A protein has these predicted regions:
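Sec-dependent bacterial lipoprotein signal peptides
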Residues: 1-22
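Ser/Thr-rich, Proline-interspersed low-complexity disordered segments
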Residues: 18, 30-35
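Extracellular/periplasmic metallocenter environments
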Residues: 21, 25-27, 48, 92-130
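N-terminal edge beta-strand
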Residues: 33-59
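Generic structural detector for well-ordered beta-strands
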Residues: 41-43, 55, 65, 90, ...
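Beta-strand cores of secreted/periplasmic/IMS beta-sandwich domains, seen most often
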Residues: 52-72, 97-105, 109
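Beta-strand signatures of extracellular beta-sandwich domains
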Residues: 75-79
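Surface-exposed loop/edge segments in extracytoplasmic proteins
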Residues: 83-89
Length: 130
């Protein structure tokens, strides 16, 4: 009789584990589609961004796919409205990086290469948010 009770308890335990596994705790990842936004393709050279003017809406995610066509490394820094760095990507010579930003307020967000002398040489752009 003890063997039968143990078998029943083990069977119930296995069934409970199976049910819990099927319901699963999951990874915590959302199954919702991400909020769509704009994606801009940008090329860097010495010493420019092309294009150098971008438009977006408040709260709209923006992605920049930045390809360095130049002969030296560059950065793509979006400055906040407070004048401080909001987000930054470093793009190696011949490389491509993707930078994401969601503007929280309307205004003109400066974009610069913060490597010495690059901004001063004209490596600047603007993200206009309405």
């Amino acid at each position: 009789m003890n063997t039968r009770k143990v078998s029943v308890v083990v069977l119930i335990g296995l069934l409970a584990l199976l049910v819990l596994a099927a319901c699963g705790g999951g990874s915590g990842a959302s199954t919702q589609a991400p909020t769509s936004g704009k994606t801009f393709s940008v090329e860097t050279t010495e010493f420019a961004y092309s294009p150098n003017m971008f438009n977006a809406s408040v709260g709209q995610p923006v992605s920049f796919k930045i390809t360095n066509k130049g002969t030296v490394d560059h950065t793509f820094v979006i400055m906040g409205l407070d004048g401080k760095e909001a987000v930054k990507a470093t793009i190696k010579t011949g490389g491509t990086e993707t930078l994401q930003f969601t503007p929280a307020a309307a205004g003109n967000y400066p974009i610069v290469c913060d490597l010495p002398g690059h901004k001063e040489a004209g490596m600047q752009a603007t993200l206009t948010v309405k």
